[in-house]
């Protein structure tokens, strides 16, 4: 239905400010007052004044007064004539007033009726609001309003005619503005009454016109509002019906979902994909629900509220949609959790690696930890790994750290079954898992995937039964201990590949070639930064066993410089040059070569008898003395330092890890014969060393050497405390057994071992501190550095106290021979031999004290230098600490580095038992310098005064 457009009243009701007969009623009253009725004189006849157009007589007061004054009183006839004329005019005026009253009364009644009718219709129109939020009710309201508008439209012509009549009346009878003085007067003249009537008509006409315009405008607005509301309600109703149908279909699909526990593990990815497709398919429902809610909100703003039925339907749609969303999200999460926990890439299968009362749990970053429900404790290490570490303690009686480390790694290798894995198999697994990029950071799940594939491939290739969950879990545990002791859950791909390559069952040369290829560029060349990264990753293996001190410590810069001496001044090194350097078995990598020899020697039997324990045949390593004929020692006796009387192990010894040949026997015979004619002093001046020494000077790690894995700054707090405690206990045990073992025949082994194990700075024996590069140190908190500084200062105080104690003992030992010689002259001859023997013992004791004092003094200097370095790091801002530290360390290390650590030639393939003839000239110079220093120390301690001065000088330095 087209909206009814009603025309408003176009009439204006003007108000006239000029009244044409303004003084007519005034003249009449004046005339009435001027002509008294009791006395009438008709002496003179006065003609009737003419009428103007308004009907008032035109009587001039001047005329009347002049006439009366001139002639005296009027004649009765004249008075009668005047009176009659007045009566006639009064009658006419009365008739005219009655006619005006009748006309105004005819207008006032219709206007009053129109005003009342319009007010009633306005109330009826207001009663139609507010509209109900239901389609049927709004349609009914629309029909009612259409009838209402027809009624109003039909009344329009009558209202227009009445308003036109009022307009015509007001145009004929204008009125003036009502003055305040006139409005307050009680006596109103006829003229005023006429104006009041005109004014009243004008007011009624104005009110009626305004009400008519207002009603017609409201009718049009109401019609539009009803049309708009009906349109929105129809849209809401259709959308809700469509949404209800769609939600019913979705709920039907949801009802067909099987419980998670009834699904097959292999089908979990398919169900996850189906849930994702289901979620995408019903995503338009979200837009539909939003549209319905927006329409309902717009209706509420326009004061149209949905009916109870529609409100309930909309609420149910919202509830069902939210429930469907929650169900889909929970279902997807359950499927993903099940796939993560039980799928092929999950760690669920690893839960069988532990037995009751242990339970394998997973931290938020996917790192496993283990719960002992019986002891109510948790730990990072697998129970089997803890047992393995406890068995490694049995190997601590091995005197030589390279062999001790190799023996420990061999046990770890066999426990992890990595000795059965070839490097070729490992490379295939690495390629399958896209581990070509060494800088890629792996998480725990990726490591588990690689290890699982590795051990499954091992089962296929070897045809042996492997406990895959146990091997994977223990290998993961070992890799985390080595490269991620902070348990951050992240590990570089280079770290992972280095760990697997070092322990796999492959030749050393192949391992080293592969490791070099991982840091080399496309031209098979490597710069110092990448080589430092490789050596840094490799040194973490002995560091985890607490053996890093004997291999130059965690600082790999001296090893990098030693290797680049083979590059002939180029900034890069080639694979052949790297292998040439490694074949010399440098101090930082000697443990890898020894591990290979230990592996080969395990199955070897030598058909000879041990000269100490009488074991025959000798299994494993065989050590032949190159000083005495027919003296062979088994690996147990040699490595633990056992020796029989007359068999000093500091003489040249040849190691064999394969059965000897006749040519080797003849060569050893000739060497032994030659050594027979050499004095003991010769062997002391030409000490044998089984590795290429690398001068370990105190310097910070190179800024280009990255940390092996992301580590938390507080992650190794307990390990550092444990390390300090073990080092202190070891030092105390050595101090206590130092004098008790001084008379043992194998004291030279202890001394060599002590020198071997303590030849590197104290900082190198700290795995947590030495492992971090300056770039990571700059980001550490100041509090962590202060803690490390406090630890180092404590150890410095311990070393200084021990240094003072040893100096005092040295003074006592120096004074004892003088007292013995002076008393020997007065004693009987039968005591001379006893005193001489005691003097020899004291001299030996003095020599050992001097050696140990020298070591402690070196440690003290290095520790003080490191403390100074740490103080500088604490005082410097982080942006400047790296560059300044690197420059300072380079300047500090250059003088000492230039003095030694040049590669030596190798005469034998057994580095721990080289012949003294093959020692280079550089090592002889170093030995002579060392001997000169010892002589100076001997002369520096003959008296208490000189020793105090020397001690003060050393401490001050």
From Swiss-Prot:
Segments forming domain WW: 358-383
UniProt-annotated stretches for the region Disordered: 876-923
Entry GO MF terms: zinc ion binding
Location of Phosphothreonine modifications: 910
Topological category with respect to the lipid bilayer: Peripheral membrane protein
Signal peptide positions on this chain: none
Name of one Pfam family that matches: EF-hand_3
Keywords assigned by UniProt, alphabetized: Cell membrane, Cell projection, Membrane, Metal-binding, Phosphoprotein, Repeat, Synapse, Zinc, Zinc-finger
Localization of this protein: Postsynaptic density; Cell projection, Dendrite; Perikaryon; Cell membrane
GO cellular component, one term: glutamatergic synapse
Protein name: Dystrophin-related protein 2
Lineage, broadest ranks: Eukaryota, Metazoa, Chordata, Craniata, Vertebrata
């Amino acid at each position: 239905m087209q909206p009814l457009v009603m025309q408003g009243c176009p009439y204006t009701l003007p108000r006239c400010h000029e009244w044409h007969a303004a003084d007519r009623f005034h003249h009449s009253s004046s005339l009435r007052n001027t002509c008294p009725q009791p006395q009438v004189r008709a002496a003179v006849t006065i003609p009737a004044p003419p009428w103007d157009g308004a009907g008032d007589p035109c009587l001039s007061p001047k005329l009347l007064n002049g006439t009366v004054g001139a002639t005296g009183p009027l004649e009765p006839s004249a008075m009668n004539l005047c009176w009659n004329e007045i009566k006639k005019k009064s009658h006419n005026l009365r008739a005219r007033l009655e006619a005006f009253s009748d006309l105004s009364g005819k207008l006032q009644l219709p206007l009053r009726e129109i005003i009342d009718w319009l007010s009633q219709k306005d109330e009826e129109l207001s009663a139609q609001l507010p509209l109900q939020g239901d389609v049927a009710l709004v349609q009914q309201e629309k029909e009612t309003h259409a009838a209402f508008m027809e009624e109003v439209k039909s009344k329009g012509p009558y209202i227009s005619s009445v308003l036109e009549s009022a307009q015509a009346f007001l145009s004929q009878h204008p009125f003036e503005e009502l003055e305040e003085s006139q409005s307050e007067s009680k006596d109103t003249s006829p003229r005023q009454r006429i104006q009041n009537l005109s004014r009243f008509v004008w007011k009624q006409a104005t009110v009626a016109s305004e009400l008519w315009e207002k009603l017609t405008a409201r009718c049009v607005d109401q019609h539009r509002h009803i049309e708009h509301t009906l349109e929105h309600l129809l849209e809401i109703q259709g959308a809700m019906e469509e949404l209800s149908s769609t939600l019913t279909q979705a709920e039907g699909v949801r009802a067909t979902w099987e419980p998670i526990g009834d699904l097959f593990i292999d089908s979990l990815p398919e169900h996850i994909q189906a849930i994702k497709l289901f979620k995408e398919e019903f995503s338009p429902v979200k837009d539909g629900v939003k549209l319905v809610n927006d329409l309902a909100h717009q209706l509420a703003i326009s004061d149209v509220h949905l009916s109870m039925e529609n409100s309930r339907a909309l609420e149910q749609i919202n509830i069902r949609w939210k429930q469907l969303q929650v169900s889909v999200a929970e279902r997807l999460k359950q499927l993903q959790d099940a796939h993560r926990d039980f799928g092929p890439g999950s760690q669920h299968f690893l839960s069988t690696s532990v037995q009751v009362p242990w339970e394998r749990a997973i931290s938020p970053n996917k790192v496993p930890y283990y719960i002992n429900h019986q002891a109510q404790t948790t730990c990072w290490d697998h129970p089997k790994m803890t047992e393995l570490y406890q068995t490694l303690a049995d190997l601590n009686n091995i005197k030589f750290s390279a062999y001790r480390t190799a023996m420990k790694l061999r046990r770890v290798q066999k426990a992890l079954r990595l000795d059965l894995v070839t490097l070729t198999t490992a490379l295939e697994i690495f390629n399958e898992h896209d581990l070509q990029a060494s800088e890629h950071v792996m998480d725990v799940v990726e490591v588990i995937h690689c290890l699982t594939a590795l051990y499954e491939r091992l089962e296929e290739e070897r045809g042996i039964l492997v406990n895959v969950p146990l091997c994977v879990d223990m290998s993961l545990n070992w890799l985390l201990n080595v490269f991620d002791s902070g348990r951050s859950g992240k590990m570089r791909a280079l770290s992972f590949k280095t760990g697997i390559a070092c322990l796999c069952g492959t030749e050393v040369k192949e391992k080293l070639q592969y490791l070099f290829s991982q840091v080399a560029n496309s031209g098979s060349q490597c710069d110092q930064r990448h080589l430092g990264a490789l050596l840094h990753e490799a040194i973490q293996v002995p560091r985890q066993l607490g053996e890093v001190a004997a291999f130059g410590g965690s600082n790999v810069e001296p090893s990098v410089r030693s290797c680049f001496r083979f590059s002939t001044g180029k900034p890069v090194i080639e694979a052949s040059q790297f292998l040439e350097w490694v074949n010399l078995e440098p101090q930082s990598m000697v443990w890898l070569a020894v591990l290979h020899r230990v592996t080969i020697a395990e199955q070897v039997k030598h058909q000879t008898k041990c000269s100490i324990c009488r074991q025959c045949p000798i299994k494993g390593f065989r050590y032949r003395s190159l000083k005495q004929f027919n003296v062979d020692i088994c690996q147990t006796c040699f490595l633990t330092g056992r020796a029989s009387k007359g068999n000093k192990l500091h003489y040249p010894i040849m190691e064999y890890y394969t059965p000897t040949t006749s040519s080797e026997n003849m060569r050893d015979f000739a060497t032994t014969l030659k050594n027979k004619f050499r004095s003991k002093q010769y062997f002391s001046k030409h000490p044998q060393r089984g590795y290429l020494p690398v001068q370990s000077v105190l310097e910070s790690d190179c800024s280009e050497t990255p940390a092996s894995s992301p580590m938390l700054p507080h992650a190794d707090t307990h390990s550092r405390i444990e390390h300090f405690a073990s080092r202190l206990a070891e030092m105390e045990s050595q101090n206590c057994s130092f004098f008790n073992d001084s008379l043992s025949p194998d004291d030279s082994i202890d001394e060599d071992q002590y020198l071997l194990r303590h030849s590197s700075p104290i900082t190198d024996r700290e795995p947590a501190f030495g492992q971090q590069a300056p770039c990571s140190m700059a980001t550490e908190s100041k509090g962590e550095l202060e803690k490390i500084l406090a630890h180092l200062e404590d150890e410095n105080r311990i070393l200084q106290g021990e240094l003072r104690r040893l100096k005092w003992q040295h003074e006592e030992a120096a004074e004892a021979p003088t007292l013995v010689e002076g008393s020997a002259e007065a004693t009987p001859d039968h005591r001379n031999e006893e005193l001489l023997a005691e003097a020899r013992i004291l001299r030996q004791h003095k020599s050992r004290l001097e050696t140990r004092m020298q070591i402690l003094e070196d440690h003290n200097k290095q520790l003080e230098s490191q403390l100074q370095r740490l103080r500088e790091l604490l005082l410097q801002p982080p942006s400047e600490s790296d560059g300044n530290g690197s420059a300072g360390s380079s300047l500090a290390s250059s003088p000492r580095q230039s003095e030694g650590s040049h590669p030596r030639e190798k005469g034998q393939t057994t580095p721990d038992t080289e012949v003294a003839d093959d020692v280079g000239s550089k090592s002889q110079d170093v030995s002579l310098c060392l001997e000169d220093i010892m002589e100076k120390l001997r002369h520096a301690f003959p008296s208490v005064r000189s020793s105090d001065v020397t001690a003060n000088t050393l401490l001050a330095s």
